[in-house]
Amino acid sequence: MLTTLKNAFKIKEIRQKILFTLGMLVVIRIGSLLPVPGVDTKFFSQWFAQQTGGAFSFFDAITGGSFLNMSILALNINPYITSSIIMQLLTIAIPKLEEMQRDGEDGRKKMVAITRYVTIALALIQSTAMAIGFGRQGYLIEFNALNVITAITALTAGSAFLMWVGERITEKGIGNGISIVLVINIISRLPQDLSNLFEQFVFGKAPATAILAVVIIFAIIIAMVVLVIILNDGVRKIPVQYAKKMQGRKMVGGQTSNIPLKVNTSGVIPIIFAQSIMQFPIIICSFIGYNGTGVWAEILKGLNSGYWCKPSQPIYSLGLLLYIVLIVFFAYFYTSITFNPLMIADNMKKQGGFIPGIRPGKPTSDYLNKILNYIVFIGAIGLIIVSVIPYFFNGVFGASVSFGGTSLIIIVSVVLETMKQVESQMLVRNYKGFLED
């Protein structure tokens, strides 16, 4: 690993890309310290500390602490991620967008521009809701039009700036810029989470107990990382044979190919969707100062991951069951709109391709559907295990950490993808890469 990094820095182009990326990440961390003008950050921090559960903890984790500090980067790149998902879904529903996506480089540029506009619109909506909510709850120094407009402008500009930084990293740096921005924010909270764990389970304990706690903590982390790597890189390859045919005086075709089906075909999307649906009511109620009464108060607690897996309050773990069901549902739903077995089977038939032992056309489509349903189920189970383990330890053992399965999946997938990109650039220049170390 160290030799590979050393070789990478020997190559001027790669060195410049790495240094540019690191420079942009430093700028982001500095920006996370700049408070939103007009917001009483001290009072807001006190309110945040009183919030129970994972809704705000997760949101703060992916913003790298910017939400807790109520900095100008508090919205993070969440509007951009939401915008990208919306555009991906609309591309399937709206033929014009689908045609634009297939229209080469020009179409891609138009899609990127539309995604930017949708991002700004979503950032405006979110920042407006936050600014007005802050004013009503007394988190603004003074609730007036100037402070509200200032907060809206600062939060929207911060989100737009992060989008711009992400695009610049993609263009001039290493890896996918948006993903790297998200990862650096998550990683910035790891020292605090590890400190909390050690303070709670290691420091002040008997030596034997402390050593056992350290071993268990790192064993769980390593096991989760290994599982995420398997989910990220696991692939089921469906063999495809192409029939031979005469073209002029030559016999062409007869090649063997495959259709790679990833174990985790939907990535982290099912978890993000499930969390968004369950945490949205909690966040809205918190901002407007409504804690609920009667049945509604119990429902809010059930939706709050901070109450899950608590032995003294098992009824609220029904919310965890709903969370699991939503993950499975969105795993199948998202895969169904991004992978079309019928279209693949039709294209294979037109090109003279077939799966050995399976007739072309509908039988091929049915076979792909059957395999895909099995793979999606396995992937969903993996996602559930990775995402539920942190909730289990938080509830049963009171481990107060914001770092969860979603964060781990994002970090591992982005790190692996970035390593592969550096690897490919190293191999072009005849250097060994990470995968050969």
Please report, for each region that a protein language model flagged, where it lies by residue.
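N-terminal cationic and glycine-rich segments that engage phosphates or anionic surfaces
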Residues: 1-101, 105-437
